From Swiss-Prot:
Residues 240-252 have a biased composition (Pro residues). Its main location: nucleus. GO terms for molecular function: DNA-binding transcription factor activity, RNA polymerase II-specific; RNA polymerase II transcription regulatory region sequence-specific DNA binding; zinc ion binding. Residues 217-232, 267-282, 981-1002, 1021-1031 have a biased composition (Basic and acidic residues). It comes from Dictyostelium discoideum. The keyword Transmembrane helix does not apply. This is Transcriptional repressor NF-X1 homolog.
């Protein structure tokens, strides 16, 4: 009320002048029409803007006035002149509400509440500035004309007065939120406007007739309006107040009116110029604007209005119209933005307004069914997110998602609601009306009443004044209390309920700092001010130190000192100021105030040091503080520092010592208890350990990382409590991060390490630079994969590759261009070698002379020195000695490395055509005999390839003869060399004489001649002895040097020189310059036999004179008697077909026929049946599955015989390769195992079902054959019975027969042999899953246990071989899930192929030699029947050829005698022929066990056991 009464008189004058301005009437109709026509060119475009501006003026009357503002009723009308008429009057009542921002609305509140100045303002067309008009500018004539015009307008368009109309919810909503779309009701004639003033204290509703502003051509863009800055109207000069004129003045003459108009035009032009100048000043001096002036709303400038104003200035008749159009422009009203696409969007529009808009447009969707929510639909709104759903949809949603606790989550905000679905009750938005019905005059789903809810999450006490609405209530529009900024210089005001976060103004804080001397120079800020940063010089209390960097106001001043010397801080040192006694100094720390008086003054000391005896009792008088204090004889008894014990010493001077009383104390970890001195305990407690003592127990509790132990002695922490943090691991983790470059720098922790935080801000490109990873690039990122071809040029220069490889990191793949290169050993040029191949080997033997000068390198063509690579050899463990490439001993190898002598680079290719030697070739030291030795070695090596024993004997004899001849030659050469040396010595005698007497004079020339004639030096004996002694020492040094050099020149291979003690060679490492050791016995294995050669034992070699021989047992004697019996009855006529017969050409022991072969010729005769030596190098029985081969041979006898015939014909032929085609894996298994049995090489071609066979150097036809072995062993599995009258016993590989001459027994023997020919039936389980094991098949055939054997051919095929047909027939009818069939022995499943075709089977030639079998004889039916065991036995029985063994044994004994004689002459032992495979059970197991043993390790010597 007080503010409303204190309205300044200027405001009242302005209100009266407003009415007078609006009553101006122009009499010049022609001028009015012309001006209006020019000004209405954009009439249609600006119609909406003018209407909105008019409505904005109307809306300004709905201002909230906190203080009662009394507005007078004004009735103003405006005239508009269309282009086609002269003068027309319109009265529009549209209430289109403009869209203004909250700041403008807030400014309107501020202007109405505090300014209370309703001034009549007029907008200038030039500058869009607000111009204030006073009554002095209006003449009396203009007032009279305006009065007439006002009366005419009142008669034509006087608005009817109607009662006050209440606001609906749309108008109320717009009133609270001007951003929303305005509600425009349809006009019905002339409708008055309701100007409602909502006052917080008193609401005064007055009816006002709001004037209409004329249509103004304002085509200014919307964006420019927003960017225009408001300008202060402070340059407007106040006009002198004129007396109030009546509302209807009297008309005056026309001449006076025109002069008044001209004066008005001049005044307006002057004011406009002042306005433009003030506008520029305001723009340039924005920083000097006062805060109070910045609160006023200033109109924006319009450039289009400026241009139009310039045209109107030239026309004086348009002044009145422009003044009338701008008369109702209220000062301080900013322009609103009416285009919804500019700033009116969902980000700035409240949720409630968005929901109202969607509901009215019927486009609001349910989040459950995605259908539009109809106006008649039953809805449910979430109380948290205010989302609307169909009631049926939300019930279905909640019923499906409800938990056991009865909670379910909202689909929009996931809030847990506890209301059960069946308790849903539809209600309006405010909750007042249950299940509201649709009313077209109200918002759908609302009750149409005022909301009245308090705003959530706000302290506002006012309730919502909007009508029932969806979404959250809008913020309260009431203003709150006035508050100050942080520094208190600026005041601000917030809306009601708005959170106050404080305000920072642009001024300085200027609060007094803590020092009390300076003020804060920072900008207005929150919190306390920072300490004063000004430093000053201060002195300590004792005066020793002066600090010039002390902060201002720090410290405490010492008031005891004088003002001229202020002191502020303590230096923490001893005071040392002189006390009042003048003798002592203060011992306290630098302190504030005066020092205490001296404590040794006689007045203050009246007792001894222990305070138990007075000085009078002691009879001592002290006169000065320097006099000593006397000591009594009592115990001190002063309480010590431990506060528990007293001093036990006598009264003494000075402080008491530490307490020496022992007390029971516990260590820091609490595990040890000891008695220690109390004083020591006190010192330990005051130290960093904070314990009485520490024990030596080491804590083994894991630290926080769970990897390291604590390791602290006497740790006070436990596994459960660690208040001191002793178990926090302080080690650095140090693990490699994922990037692979950096390590984890965190403290040791459990779990995974973090990712590497280092990034690269450079582009990571591929090597060619065409693929790039943009930064930042995490550490450890690999270069990108590039699909472009590699651009790196090779060093070799080749670029025409078969395929171009992609861009890559790292080196390029090896070059595949084919070039010609010299082999690594320098033997020949290799063609079509890859360019990237460094060492191309030609495959030949190296043949370079080694460093020992006795061997050549046996390695395949290689690069680098010819040394043995012993990197992978364990020197500590004795390695088995091999015939080639053996490892040198450790000492020799170290000597070789220390010497570092270069190896000889001579490329002496002395290798012969037999390059498959088993040891490096020996080179004799005598150069003259090298060629002879090479020839002898060639012959010897070629002769060794023959299989006849006679040839071996001859070759050995030749070798012995050659060696003897070489020795003789060496001896002769040595003798000749010795003679030559003696001759040289005799010749040297004359030279000595010449040199010794070279210095003699001419007088003694005759004596010199005489001395020259003598052959000896007779005068210089002493000098000669000295020279000889020196030469002898030099020779010894040279010999030692030579021995050391020769010791370092060892090649590391076997020596290989034949030993003198036996027929074996030296197996020591190469030892150049040293003879083979004779004190070491030969370690080679030999086999000794009994007299009849039936028994044999393997033992160590004992030299050439080995006379050890086994004794024959009873079996030998029995067989000897049988031989003699056969010889007595039948003689030797059956020895022609015996393979052991000396007269038989197939006899390997035949000494009468010898066949010598060279390296350039091949044997055309078939290879004889030989017996493999188990001690040979090529013998590898561990790779042969002999038991499985014998087992499958019982099921496939026909197939075995066909394979044997194929292999034997291949061995007897000149072919180097044989190709066989097979059908399934069983044939492949048989072919591979038989190839191992015959010791042949093979190569599989599984995709083509081919297998190729090649001959080895050790290929032989085994004896007995596999079919014979199966026939002999087959008696154990057959169901038939064999007569005991004819039995074959196999002992150590040789068969002997004990028979009777009964014909019936012979027939039984033949029948038994025929029964052995029958194959064992078998079942083939095929296509088995890899998970099927032997146990599965064993469980299937468990009822036939002991009557079958299983043999896995491969991972998916298995054979079950049965011993009788009954069990087989029962097993073949068993039902199982496995796939099986009866195995068929079909020889036609394998065929021989030559090239890509399979040969047909030719018949054997009738004229073929009986000694040589036909290559394809195994395919002849006649030959096949003859090859059977039954046929051979029957033929022998018919001819009584079974007695030929007697003659055979007899001839063998004769041959052995001859061999023994030859051995005695040549000192060479011939190995007897021993069969490889034995068919008896005991011997077979022994042979299998022996085959699995390593031949290089301990060998059992059975000689001592026998």
């Amino acid at each position: 009320m007080e503010e409303s009464q204190n309205i300044p008189p200027k405001t009242q004058t302005l209100n009266n002048s407003e009415n007078s301005i609006n009553n101006i009437n122009n009499n010049n109709l022609t001028t009015t029409t012309t001006t209006t026509a020019v000004g209405n060119t954009n009439y249609k475009n600006n119609n909406r803007y003018n209407n909105n501006r008019y409505n904005r003026n109307n809306f300004n009357n709905y201002n909230n006035n906190n203080n009662n503002n009394n507005n007078n009723n004004n009735m103003v009308t405006s005239t508009t002149s269309p282009p086609t008429t002269t003068t027309t009057t319109t009265s529009t009542t549209t209430t289109a509400t403009p869209s203004s921002n909250s700041n403008n609305r807030r400014k309107n509140y501020h202007n109405n509440n505090y300014n209370n100045n309703n001034n009549n303002n007029q907008l200038s067309e030039d500058t869009d500035e607000v111009i204030l008009y006073t009554p002095a500018d209006i003449s009396a004539s203009l007032k009279s004309e305006s009065a007439k015009q006002q009366q005419q307008q009142q008669q034509q368009s006087l608005p009817t007065q109607e009662p006050t109309q209440t606001l609906n919810w749309q108008q109320e909503l717009y009133k609270l939120n001007p951003k929303s779309k305005a509600f425009v009701p349809k006009p019905q004639g002339s409708v008055p406007f309701n100007n409602t003033n909502n006052n917080n204290n008193n609401n005064n509703n007055n009816n006002n007739n709001v004037p209409q502003s004329p249509i103004k051509d304002n085509n200014r863009p919307q964006r420019e309006r927003r960017e225009r800055k408001p300008k202060e109207n402070n340059t407007q000069q106040p006009q002198p107040q004129q007396p109030q004129q009546p509302q209807q003045p009297q008309p005056q003459p026309q001449q006076q009116q025109q002069s008044q108009q001209q004066q008005t035009v001049k005044e307006n032009n002057r004011k406009k110029e002042n306005k433009l100048q003030s506008k520029k000043d305001i723009i340039t001096n924005n920083d000097n604007i006062e805060p109070i002036k910045s609160k006023e709303d200033i109109s924006l400038a319009n450039k289009f209005a400026k241009n139009r104003a310039k045209e109107n200035l030239a026309k004086t008749n348009s002044i009145n119209n422009s003044n009338t159009a701008n008369s109702n422009k209220i000062k301080g009203k900013t322009k609103f933005i009416f285009n919804e696409n500019d700033e009116k969007n969902s980000e700035y529009t409240p949720l409630a307004i968005q929901m109202i808009t969607k509901i009215q447009a019927n486009i609001y969707e349910c989040m459950v069914c995605f259908e539009n929510v109809g106006k008649n639909a039953v809805i449910w709104s979430c109380s948290q997110c205010f989302t609307m759903f169909h009631s049926s949809c939300i019930k279905q949603w909640s019923s499906k998602s409800v938990t056991t606790e009865g909670k379910w989550k909202c689909p929009g905000c996931r809030y847990n609601h506890e209301v059960k679905p069946e308790h849903f009750q539809p209600a309006c938005f405010c909750g007042k009306v249950k299940d509201p019905q649709y009313n077209p005059y109200h918002l759908a789903h609302s009750c149409g009443e005022v909301c009245g809810k308090l705003r959530a999450k706000s302290n506002c006490p006012h309730s919502c004044t909007m009508l029932c609405h969806p979404g959250p209530c809008l913020n309260c529009s009431s203003l709150g209390d006035i508050k100050d900024c942080y520094c208190g210089k600026t005041k601000y005001r917030l809306l009601c309920g708005e959170v106050d976060k404080g305000k920072v103004c642009e001024g300085k804080c200027e609060k007094l700092l803590s020092c009390g001397n300076h003020r804060c120079q920072q900008q207005c800020h929150s919190g306390s001010c920072s300490p004063c940063e000004v430093v000053e010089t201060q002195k300590c209390y004792c005066g020793k130190h002066i600090d010039k960097t002390k902060p201002c106001g720090s410290g405490s001043i010492d008031t005891s000192q004088s003002d001229d010397d202020p002191r502020f801080f303590s230096c923490a040192e001893k005071c040392d100021r002189t006390l009042d006694c003048g003798n002592h100094k203060c011992q306290r720390t630098c302190h504030k105030g005066d020092c205490e008086p001296c404590s040794l003054v006689p007045d203050r000391v009246d007792r001894c040091n222990c305070k138990q005896t007075t000085l009078e009792e002691l009879g001592v008088v002290r006169t000065s503080c320097l006099d000593p204090i006397p000591v009594c004889k009592k115990v001190c008894s002063t309480l010590l520092a431990c506060k528990q014990h007293s001093c036990t010493d006598r009264c003494h001077t000075g402080p008491c010592g530490s307490c020496k009383v022992k007390v029971r104390s516990i260590c820091r970890c609490g595990k040890t208890t000891e008695n220690r001195q109390c004083g020591v305990i006190q010192q330990n407690m005051s130290s960093t350990s904070a314990a009485a003592f520490t024990c030596g127990n080491v804590c083994k509790i894991l630290r926080s990382c769970k990897r390291h132990e604590c390791g602290v002695k006497c740790c006070p922490s436990t596994s459960s409590s660690d208040e001191a943090g002793n178990h926090v691991c302080t080690l650095v983790c140090g693990k490699q991060l994922k990037c692979g470059v950096h390590k984890c720098q965190q403290l040791c922790h459990s779990g995974k390490c973090y990712n590497c935080y280092i990034n690269s801000y450079d582009d990571l490109a591929c090597p060619c630079g065409k693929t790039v990873i943009q930064p930042p690039v995490p550490c450890g990122t690999k270069p990108p994969m590039c699909n472009h071809p590699c651009t790196i040029k090779r060093e070799c220069g080749h670029s025409n590759e078969v395929w171009e490889h992609k861009c890559h990191s790292g080196p390029c793949p090896p070059c595949t261009y084919l070039v010609d290169k010299m082999c690594a050993g320098g033997h020949q040029v290799q063609k079509s070698v890859k360019c990237s191949t460094i060492d191309a080997s030609c495959g030949r033997i190296c043949g370079k002379v080694l460093s020992c000068l006795s061997h050549t390198c046996p390695r395949i063509c290689h690069s680098g020195p010819c040394l043995i690579n012993n990197n992978n050899v364990n020197i500590n463990k004795q390695q088995p000695l091999l015939p080639a490439n053996l490892i040198a001993s450790k000492n020799n190898y170290q000597l070789q490395q220390q010497s570092k002598l270069p190896t000889t680079t001579t490329t002496t290719t002395t290798t012969t055509s037999t390059t498959s030697t088993t040891s490096p070739k020996i080179i004799e030291k005598d150069e003259e005999l090298i060629e002879d030795d090479n020839n002898n070695n060639n012959n010897n090596n070629n002769n060794n390839n023959n299989n006849n024993n006679n040839n071996n004997n001859n070759n050995n004899n030749n070798n012995n003869n050659n060696n003897n001849n070489n020795n003789n030659n060496n001896n002769n050469n040595n003798n000749n060399n010795n003679n030559n040396e003696k001759a040289e010595i005799t010749n040297e005698c004359n030279h000595d004489h010449d040199h010794e007497h070279e210095h003699s004079d001419d007088e003694n020339s005759e004596e010199e001649v005489d001395l020259n004639e003598c052959n000896h030096n007779h005068e210089c004996n002493e000098e000669e002895e000295r020279i000889k002694k020196e030469e002898k020492e030099d020779d010894e040094d040279e010999d030692e040097l030579f021995d050391s050099l020769m010791g370092n020149l060892t090649c590391g291979y076997l020596c290989g020189i034949p030993l003198k003690s036996c027929e074996h060679t030296c197996h020591q490492a190469c030892h150049p310059g040293e003879p083979c050791p004779t004190n070491i016995s030969c370690k080679q294995k030999v086999r000794i036999y009994c007299k009849c050669k039936r028994r044999s034992v393997e033992t160590l070699c004992c030299g050439k004179d080995d006379t050890r021989q086994l004794e024959c047992d009873e079996v030998c004697e029995k067989e000897e008697r049988e031989k003699q019996l056969k010889e007595a009855f039948y003689g030797s006529h059956t020895l022609d077909n015996n393979p052991n017969n000396p007269n038989n050409p197939n006899n390997p022991n035949n000494n009468t026929t010898t066949t010598t072969t060279t390296t350039t010729t091949t044997t055309s005769s078939p290879t004889n049946f030989t017996v493999l030596d188990p001690t040979s190098i090529d013998y590898q029985p561990n790779k042969l599955q002999i038991e499985a081969l014998q087992l499958i041979a019982k099921a496939s006898p026909k197939l075995i015989k066909k394979i044997e015939a194929i292999y034997e014909d291949f061995i007897n032929s000149n072919l180097l390769k044989q190709t066989i085609k097979y059908t399934d894996s069983i044939q492949l298994f048989l072919l591979v195992q038989m190839a191992k049995f015959y010791q042949m090489k093979y190569r599989e071609k599984k995709p083509l079902n081919y297998i190729e066979f090649f001959k080895k150097t050790s290929y032989q036809i085994p004896s007995p054959r596999l079919s014979e072995m199966v026939g002999i062993n087959g008696s154990s599995l057959s169901s038939g019975t064999i007569s005991n009258s004819l039995s074959f016993s196999i002992n150590n590989g040789q068969s002997y027969a004990s028979i009777s001459l009964s014909p019936s027994e012979m027939v039984a023997q033949a029948q038994a042999q025929a029964e052995l020919e029958n194959q064992c039936p078998a079942l083939l389980f095929k296509n088995l899953d890899p998970s099927i094991k032997t146990d599965h098949l064993t469980n299937l055939l468990q009822e036939f246990e002991g009557r079958y054997k299983l043999m896995w051919v491969d991972d998916s095929n298995c054979l079950a071989i049965f011993g009788d047909s009954i069990s087989f027939s029962m097993a073949s009818q068993i039902k199982t899930m496995f796939t099986y069939e009866i195995y068929q022995d079909d020889p036609s499943l394998i065929d021989i192929t030559f090239g890509n075709s399979v040969l047909s089977t030719p018949t054997s030639s009738s004229g073929s030699n009986s000694g040589v079998s036909s290559p394809l004889s195994y395919l002849s039916p006649l030959k096949k029947s003859q090859d059977t065991q039954f046929f051979r036995v029957s033929q022998q029985m018919n001819k009584f050829s079974f007695l030929d063994t007697i003659n055979q044994n007899q001839n063998q004994n004769n041959n052995n005698n001859n061999n023994n004689n030859n051995n005695n002459n040549s000192n060479i032992n011939i190995k007897p022929t021993i069969p490889l495979y034995s068919t008896s059970t005991a011997n077979a197991n022994r042979m299998l066990r022996r085959s699995n043993e390593n031949t290089g390790e301990n060998v059992a010597d059975d000689w001592e056991n026998l």
